From Swiss-Prot:
Cellular compartments per GO CC: plasma membrane
Subcellular location per the Swiss-Prot or TrEMBL entry: Cell inner membrane
Protein name per the record: Putative membrane protein insertion efficiency factor
Similarity comment: Belongs to the UPF0161 family.
Membrane topology per record: Peripheral membrane protein
Entry keyword annotation includes Membrane: yes
Stretch list, region Disordered: 66-85
Length: 85
């Protein structure tokens, strides 16, 4: 079962959803990556929480510019802290 989202993560996801529903349709498709930066951000926040999810999202958005060719760039998997070495 997935852990519950923090209030901060919920707020950030709400802001991203607002962007997706209001601003993104006006701008048209511009993201060079798959999944899009906004979908990446939501997944990163759900998977890693507010701090690390925000950091991963910021790094992704900063890579999304005309000099980067883009392509497939999924959210990294969350490693299990209880794994055996």
């Amino acid at each position: 079962m997935a852990s519950p989202l923090s209030p901060g993560s919920r707020i950030l996801i709400g802001l991203i959803r607002g962007y997706q529903l209001v601003i993104s349709p006006l701008l048209g498709p511009r993201c060079r990556f798959h999944p899009t930066c906004s979908h990446y951000g939501i997944e990163a926040l759900r998977r890693f929480g507010m701090i690390k999810g925000s950091w991963l999202t910021l790094k992704r958005v900063l890579k999304c510019h005309p000099l980067n060719s883009g392509g497939d760039d999924p959210v990294p998997p969350k490693l299990d802290d209880n794994r055996e070495h």
